[in-house]
């Protein structure tokens, strides 16, 4: 029987029998895991507060055949502002949902782990949710092997010089007019949108609050990412 001490962020939880919780947790050392917290729904349980959705927690785990069992949990960091604001709570939920869909069980992804944490902190501190979400979505794609090509044509590799081009999900990024097929779904993409995507891709957590982007640009990035993320998942999705 193996035991582990790890740090994790709770993405989601559901009822599991009488008074128990089945949790999806991303961790530093074990990757994404499923874990049962026995008795976590009970009012007097010490695990209850430490295993709230979106909390950062030290967890002592025991491995069973099908999942991990949470023996002990100690909260490290909470984001109280998320729970008092419906829009922020939904934004955090979208981050958790996308992370769960793109992060396979048992795989390590320290860069994505850190960016989930950064994004929750930014939401909790009052940074514009739309810009936090677009930044997170682009970083998610980058850290899971789907970073969109935004500096040159994804087909012929012609450098982008600020013209009106197109974004193709199948090509994985921007496509020049000469390479755009007649058929298929392509999004017209203007220079300010390409510039905005690159700024969001490169922004650090410290610089993101200072990033000034027109809301129309942010909304256009959302439209493109909504289709691109859905394309990678194999199903249409809706972003906030």
Curated annotation (Swiss-Prot):
InterPro entries: ARFGAP/RecO (IPR037278), DNA_rep/recomb_RecO_N (IPR022572), NA-bd_OB-fold (IPR012340), RecO (IPR003717), RecO_C (IPR042242)
Pfam families per UniProt: RecO_C, RecO_N
Record-level GO cellular component terms: bacterial nucleoid
Keywords assigned by UniProt, alphabetized: DNA damage, DNA recombination, DNA repair
One biological process term in Gene Ontology: DNA recombination
Family classification: Belongs to the RecO family.
NCBIfam families: reco
Biological role: Involved in DNA repair and RecF pathway recombination.
Protein name in UniProt: DNA repair protein RecO
Organism whose genome encodes this protein: Carboxydothermus hydrogenoformans (strain ATCC BAA-161 / DSM 6008 / Z-2901)
